[in-house]
């Protein structure tokens, strides 16, 4: 009898079907070693997943027989009176649906001001199974579970051993012929590549339909059903459905099993759903990062690691509603961030702070509006691909949007200046962006722009406006962002007007108390111009311009919306430059 320590699942479909199979295999091998403290790790490689055991396992009939008693995924009872196979633990979909419906009605009554009775909690799995049910995936998994439980013990054992041996030898599970060979329907919610599409090799008369069941390997689908109970989640996007699967980069089954209870944020828009799913995973990892290092099975981001070193991505499949059907319309992958690694406990706190702040800022964006949808798109590109230029473009565009939002007296949220500085410093210490934000001229000009825009907007709202509000300044900087001379002209003209207003205010007040602003010096402008000279590339110039808007539109270090805490400065006859 052969002993095996490593097993392989290829990335054949290019979808989350491969991930589901790899996670399912991880759980199966963990169970075959008795569960409990058994350590089974799944690692993502370029073209496959490798599932590794702490100790080699001998595959034989007696060992795998445990899978017949517990096929490792739930039988879902969707109709009153429906019974699960003997010995298996069912998931009561009917009862959980009744509780979910009660919650929905309770929310309506709460809005009407009525008192509410205490309700039982809905299982986090219900909302996943609900979407699987809509996508017609429950029948296939229930049917296979029934066949596994009812199979002849020796035939099932021989089949499982043969399939696992094939995976251990780097072959496909479908290459191992077995006497136990149930037919499994091709279901797109578990395997998006078998969804509606062109399946013939030639163009003449190509039919649109699912992959025939004869081409679907029952063991691979079994692994996917197991994996779906661990890492599959979803969102309703209007009448459409978006399913998500967490991709392990390097995680043990105990890592993954805790995801079964993770309740992802629920939103009804696609881009925001992607972003919040990543945020939820990062916060989940950071909450576990302070577990003692000696517990090798526990969830933690090790020293020197970033979130992407544990979970590489969230794979998605979008099912578009066409009335009576919801065919697959888009397959994508959203990477987890690798902004900076956790080097000490303080970094865990910073991660949490950044994520919560960014979540709050993005929450107000309405994806149904073109400008705000583009903001979310830029942020998602940054989050998924560590695309810092997209983030800078997001910050610049967000500054413009928030100015208009404030003037319309609509709620808005801003980034905190200190947090932005920390994010850039911790994540990009070797890149020019740190040199830019530490430049004294840049800092002083950004502060002056903030005083002439968001600070004076705040003063206007309080009935204390003194200076002109430069409403179009952010947009003008954004328009000229790629052109060094034109950008410098915009900044120079602003400084000239800013200093003129300050001088006129000083003349009006003379030695009387009142709110003043400090002028921008020629030295500041010179340092900013030299900064542009050091980074003459168009993208670099654009990055500096976007950073200028970002730091001009963010909150001060105290977390206040403006610098009005500095208002009504006592008169001084000392000329102090910013």
Describe every region a protein language model picked out.
Residues 1-138, 302-578:
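Long, contiguous all-alpha helical interaction modules
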